[in-house]
From Swiss-Prot:
It comes from Pongo abelii (Sumatran orangutan). This is Anion exchange transporter. The chain crosses the membrane at residues 76-96, 147-167, 171-191, 203-223, 228-248, 255-275, 307-327, 344-364, 384-404, 405-425, 449-469. One of its GO terms (molecular function) is chloride:bicarbonate antiporter activity. Residues 97-146, 192-202, 249-254, 328-343, 426-448 are extracellular.
Length: 656
């Protein structure tokens, strides 16, 4: 190797592998979105609405954290931690300005399966009841949260792995009907899980296939064990919550700050329970002791990761899909963009980091996001401000929640799921717009109810792909290109006789194994139809119509016209501008079209081809030695045909 070449190679290598300062800054801003918006934060315009939204969000985070921790079969205090740490991590790495990450009903329900399976309730009598050094909780409670933290950790690892593999671009298969049906079904599961608290019943943990129906069967079998006091308090709480929230919605334009009815109800119910000693007098279940402070971080137990991999995948997929839908809705509403892959990273890190602080799996929630909308939040600063108030609850106010009745907490959760439950109204929309989507919605909801949210999500995605695969090969792949515009462009440069022997076909779809044969059939049918309009039927019937070339040669195979065929050579131009991607079968079919036409004295030219298509066809069909068949535009291809025709005329004159 010469010195000049070695120097040139080393310079190229140095240029390729030496990152520039601007590249590093851009990478940091792309992976840490907070660096992009925080320096431009407008204190004067945004701080007040973000503060108000943060206070209201903190109320939601605390109530949902307590309830979803119980839903996840762990001590309520861990729900407070799950409302704190994920929100901080997402504010740094996430792109959704109105996405409130924290505890989530669907992920809590999934993680509860692992907790109840590995540390069942009957183990409480087998483990030591002495308080541990962590938060003063029993060994049983700590074993349970370690399982939930392991689910959170492994779920986060899966999400980060999906970010590395750039699988965010594959989320297009999770359509709106699938998300709507899955979240509605999961919300129905959550409501069902709260029935025992609403009725004041003691009920064993029921899960698994058809567990939804077994729960209601158990309720009806033990209907006499319902506590009337809990039922009445639940009904009163639900009525108050629904009424006040509806009034807030009606008058939100006239009042600047809505009434925090959740907070008012918590204070009133706790005070009433304390004054009347409802826990002992009426046997109402209360939240109980809430430890103060945050424990030192500790790694989740790695030895049980293999045992929770099913729940971890469910948490990773369901949590991400639900959160992404909210982030995309926020971006669409407020006119900004998000990166689907970056959301994988943000939620993955939220789950991984939080698992070291005894947190249950996290995701964004519809109720909290809607709350940020209604209170006028501008940025993730609202979530960070809410974290300050959550810290106050953890260190100071937490013990006062001891007397909060569980039936009131369950009522708050049920009413908070209203946004998901009213998605039943989407059925009318899907029925009127696309009945196949209606069928996918109903079947996905049924599978979610009968099995679980992750099973319903998987079923919905499979149904969507099956519908696409079933309909894709039947979609029209080619069409005759409008010739009027083309004639106008070329009429000053060439005679119209050239265009009479040219057929321009537009490829409208990707060419893959699903539609390769359909492409060939469509191409032949269109050309036969065009030719049938310009020739007698008797001529067509005398031709072989099973091959592409006989279609292109105008069907004139009788003796009267056979002499004119060589002089009137036809050309086929394939406009590949709508040809977005291809596979081996697609390239094989294109080469087959070319070779078939070549053997029948028909020229096939391709316009608007990508470099990858040219390379693939050249390699597959060994076209290196062929005359030019690839052109940058349809006009260039027609000009090539016209030039060849003029050369042919000159050749004929010279022979004469």
């Amino acid at each position: 190797m010469t010195g000049a070449k070695r120097k040139k190679k080393s310079m190229l290598w140095s240029k390729m592998h030496t990152p520039q300062c601007e590249d590093i800054i851009q990478w940091c801003r792309r992976r840490l979105p907070i660096l992009d918006w925080a320096p431009h934060y407008n204190l004067k315009e945004n701080l007040l609405p973000d503060t108000v939204s943060g206070i209201m969000l903190a109320v939601q985070q605390v109530t949902q954290g307590l309830a979803f921790a119980v839903l996840s079969s762990v001590h309520p205090v861990f729900g407070l931690y799950g409302s704190l740490f994920p929100a901080i991590i997402y504010a740094i790495f996430g792109m959704g300005r109105h996405v409130a990450t924290g505890t989530f009903a669907l992920t809590s329900l999934i993680s509860a399966n692992a907790v109840e399976r590995i540390v069942p309730q009957n183990m409480q009598n087998l483990t030591t009841q002495s308080n541990t050094s962590v938060l003063g909780l029993s060994d049983f409670e700590m074993q349970r949260i370690r399982v939930a933290a392991a689910v959170s950790f492994l779920g986060g690892v899966i999400q980060v792995a999906m970010f590395v593999l750039q699988l965010g671009s594959a989320t297009f298969v999770v359509t709106e009907p699938v998300i709507s049906a899955m979240t509605t079904g999961a919300a129905t599961h959550v409501v069902t899980s709260q029935v025992k608290y609403l009725l004041g019943m003691k009920m064993p943990y029921i899960s698994g296939p058809l567990g939804f129906f077994y729960i209601y069967a158990y309720v009806f079998e033990n209907i006499k064990s319902v506590r009337l006091e809990a039922l009445l308090l639940s009904l009163l709480s639900i009525v108050v919550l629904v009424l006040v929230k509806e009034l807030n919605e009606q008058f939100k334009r006239k009042i600047k700050v809505v009434l925090p009815v959740d907070l008012v109800l918590i204070i009133a119910a706790s005070f009433a329970c304390y004054c009347t000693n409802m826990e002992n007098t009426y046997g109402l279940e209360v939240v109980g002791h809430i430890p103060q402070g945050i424990p030192s971080p500790r790694a989740p137990p790695m030895n049980i990761l293999s045992a929770v991999i099913t729940e971890a995948f469910g948490v990773a997929l369901v949590g991400y899909v639900a959160s992404l839908a909210l982030a995309q809705g926020s971006a669409k509403k407020f006119k900004y963009s998000i990166d689907d892959n970056q959301e994988f990273l943000a939620h993955g890190l939220s789950n991984i980091v939080s698992s070291f602080f005894f947190c249950i799996p996290s995701a964004a929630a519809m109720g909290r996001t809607a709350g940020l909308y209604s209170t006028g939040a501008k940025t993730q600063v609202a979530c960070l401000i809410s974290c300050i108030f959550i810290l106050i609850v953890i260190y100071a106010i937490g013990p006062l929640l001891y007397w909060l009745p569980m039936c009131v907490l369950a009522s708050i959760i049920v009413v908070g799921l209203k946004g998901m439950l009213i998605q039943f109204r989407d059925l009318k929309k899907y029925w009127n717009v696309h009945k196949i989507d209606w069928g996918i919605w109903v079947s996905t909801y049924v599978f979610t109810i009968c099995f679980a949210a992750n099973v319903g999500l998987l079923f919905g995605v499979v149904c969507t792909i099956a519908v696409v695969i079933g309909r894709f090969p039947r979609t029209m792949t080619v069409s005759i290109k409008n010739m009027k515009e083309m004639e106008f462009k070329v009429k000053t440069e060439m005679d119209s006789e050239t265009l009479q022997q040219v057929k321009i076909i537009s490829i409208n779809n990707p060419l893959v194994f699903l539609n390769a044969k359909k492409f060939y059939t469509d191409l032949m049918n269109i050309i036969q139809k065009e030719n049938a309009c310009n020739q007698p039927l008797d001529d067509i019937s005398k031709c072989e119509q099973n091959t592409l070339l006989n279609s292109l040669s105008n069907g004139n195979c009788n003796e009267e016209t056979s002499q004119s065929c060589p002089n009137e050579k036809c050309s086929l131009i394939l406009d590949c501008s709508g040809f977005t991607f291809f596979d081996y079968s697609g390239v094989s079919m294109l080469v087959e079209v070319y070779m078939d036409s070549k053997g029948r004295s028909v020229d096939v030219l391709l316009a608007h081809c990508t470099a990858s298509l040219i390379k693939a066809m050249t390699y597959y069909g060994n076209l290196d030695s062929e005359k030019p068949i690839f052109f940058e535009s349809v006009s260039a291809a027609i000009s090539h045909i016209h030039s060849n025709k003029n050369l042919s005329k000159l050749s004929d004159h010279s022979e004469v």
